Amino acid sequence: MSHTAEIPLVPGSESPLELKPLKAADPHVVYHRRAHRLLSLAKDSPLADYFELCRRLVSIQAKLAEEADFGQLLAWGKDEATPLSLLGSEADSYWQGLLQQLLSDLLPQVDESIARVVRLLMQQSPEQLSSWGRSLRQGHVSEVPAHFSLFIWAAMGVYWSHWAPMVIKRMDQRKVAQQSMCPVCGCHPVASVIVDQPRAGLRYLHCSLCESEWHYIRAHCTSCGQDKEMTIWSLDDAQAQVRIESCDECHGYTKMMFVEMSPSMDVVADDLATLMLDSELNAKGFGATTLNPLLMAHEIT
């Protein structure tokens, strides 16, 4: 159960063909679909055990997204570029409460090695958790113990994704500029998704925290913005469902998920399932400018 601050909605066009700068997610639906996709992908993956852990975690996220008490929307920067990035320390108690619920639900579902990590995380102080949460949201992954990051981000994701749709309704989307970071919460994208609605071939970046999507013109680097020296890579053919767009100027890259070709795809799960593409690009001297909430393995600046 949750309550929304009394902030007037910003009117928008009703044209079905209008390009939407921002698209809100239904977190319960997103998490449910992600869990199903992880189950499907695990069948042919050498990382089947890890996929199963992630599936259980995401299934708990789906449950919390539907059943948890999120309190009321805290003060947020409605006139700022990334309003949910400005939530104060009051938000910490809410997402930390979700973290304890998530860990309690997960504990009986994991083996003893994971259970030890879960119990240790449950014993951390609120101040320590707040510090780690800030570091993760700022992309400073190395400042947080690697064995805790997955669970902390999962809890924060449930909280931020709950409020993002309501905040988006109250944002003036006419002021949303093309940008590398999420216009709602300020976090990194997971990857690009190529969609066929409202028009075929549109690209959106998918947020790693609040699950929102924002439009970004294709053939432009999603990190530095240049549009002249871009290269497309794929493992099999030019029409692959997952491809990588790399930038010859900043040497960053982002994956592109062609969900128009395969509607069952999930940006987080399918990014995790195509790590061989990352290995190929890393070997060529390129680095990801994105963050996967299920594999927080590198520093992002």
Swiss-Prot record:
Can you list the GO cellular component terms from the UniProt entry?
cytosol
SUPFAM superfamilies assigned to the protein according to its UniProt record, in alphabetical order: FdhE-like
Q: Which CDD domains match?
A: FdhE
Where is this protein found? Answer: Cytoplasm
Keyword Cytoplasm tagged: yes
Primary location class: cytoplasm
**Recorded superkingdom:** Bacteria
Q: Tell me, what's a Pfam family for it?
A: FdhE_N
Per UniProt, which keywords does this protein have?
Cytoplasm
Gene Ontology biological process: protein maturation
**What GO molecular functions are on record for this protein?**
ferric iron binding
Role of this protein: Necessary for formate dehydrogenase activity.
Please give the HAMAP family that the UniProt record associates with this protein: FdeH
The record's annotation in PANTHER family points to:
PROTEIN FDHE
Q: Which NCBIfam families match?
A: FdhE
Record family assignment: Belongs to the FdhE family.
What protein is this chain from?
Protein FdhE homolog
Q: What is the lineage of its organism?
A: Bacteria, Pseudomonadati, Pseudomonadota, Gammaproteobacteria, Alteromonadales
